[in-house]
A protein has these predicted regions:
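Charged/polar low-complexity intrinsically disordered segments
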Residues: 5, 13, 29-30
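Short, low-complexity, charge-dense intrinsically disordered segments
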Residues: 23-26, 35, 40, 46
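Active-site rim beta-loop-alpha module in soluble metabolic enzymes
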Residues: 205-238
């Protein structure tokens, strides 16, 4: 091509490849961050390296294998100990509660109406949280506990006790899955939910078929122990750990009230330990509800991806 002499040719500018690459990597990481954050900011498996850079899955990369070993070790030891125990039949004196007063035509009045908080907490959770199966199952179990426990305390016997324990088993299984989702990995928690529910249901059927409560007691005991281990070994992904601690303390208090039913009732003959157990357990469920209502995603400024600003305090 001819170029007139009075028009100087312009040299072609070189593309700054390093700057272009930097901008591309920054925008790609931002896109990956948006893609990697699922419902309510949870890390998905789409971009585990990016999640790790934010500190969301630090425990997975550093502690996954040891914790899996601890988890299955606890599982094996607890189940092994269960086999060594003799069968545990349902003690019929369990149905003889200290407070058996009939008020307004309702037998065992306070043990029945003290289940109303379960209905309120469960309904609030179901109304607010509908996307995660484990969360739905947990609050569904809490809601149904209000119905099943009221039904049982209206006429305490083994048949009605089954419908009291069934929804509690749903909540125990879902609680373990929730903590695995929150502390370890969302996918692992979602997978764990269904076998945990199956084991819980089987434990109740085994009790009704063979009058053996060993597996049911394990279903109550093991999730609490596993949750404690997970809390000790894994970093939280969300704020609000104090709500989990409050829930644990309140549930322990509920079990204490259960074992001191008559002693508490004998003090004033007003409220029994079992009534207080219902209120403390419902308060524990409320603490978990508050956790889900108020939690915020925790980010780690020291390991932020390139191109992303520091999070505001």
């Amino acid at each position: 091509m001819c170029v007139p002499k009075d028009v100087p040719s312009q040299p072609r500018r070189k593309r700054d490849s390093s700057n272009f690459g930097h901008r591309f990597r920054g925008s790609h990481q931002i896109f990956s961050l948006r893609r990697g954050l699922g419902h309510e900011g949870e890390c998905s498996s789409a971009s585990p390296s990016l999640c790790y850079s934010l500190g969301m899955t630090r425990g997975i990369a550093k502690q996954n294998l040891p914790v899996v070993g601890v988890f299955f070790g606890l599982l094996a030891v607890s189940l092994g100990g269960l086999v060594l125990l003799p069968p545990i039949p349902q003690d019929q004196s369990y149905h003889q509660f200290a407070d058996q007063r009939t008020i307004f035509g309702i037998p065992n009045f306070w043990n029945v109406v003290s289940n109303l908080p379960f209905l309120a907490v469960g309904a609030a959770g179901l109304r607010r949280f509908r996307n995660d199966p484990a969360t739905v199952v947990f609050f569904l179990g809490v809601f149904l506990t209000g119905i099943g426990s009221s039904y049982y305390h209206w006429d305490p016997n083994d048949g009605t006790l089954f419908w009291d324990r069934l929804p509690m088993t749903l909540s125990f299984a879902a609680l373990l899955a929730l903590v695995v989702e929150e502390r370890v990995n969302a996918r692992a928690g979602a997978i764990l939910l269904w076998p945990a529910l199956a084991i819980g249901l089987f434990s109740l059927l085994l009790w009704r078929w063979n009058d053996d409560l060993r597996l049911y007691f394990w279903v109550q005991f093991f999730p609490g122990l596993a949750v404690l281990v997970l809390f000790l070994l894994y970093q939280p992904k969300y704020t609000g750990t104090h709500y989990w601690i409050a829930a644990g303390v309140l549930y322990a208090l509920a079990k204490l009230f259960e074992f001191t039913d008559g002693a508490i009732y004998s003090v004033r003959n007003f409220l029994s330990g079992h009534t207080l157990k219902h209120l403390a357990a419902a308060a524990a469920c409320f603490a978990i509800l508050r956790y889900f209502q108020t939690r915020r995603l925790i980010t780690w400024p020291s390991a932020r991806p390139v191109g992303l600003p520091l999070p505001k305090a």
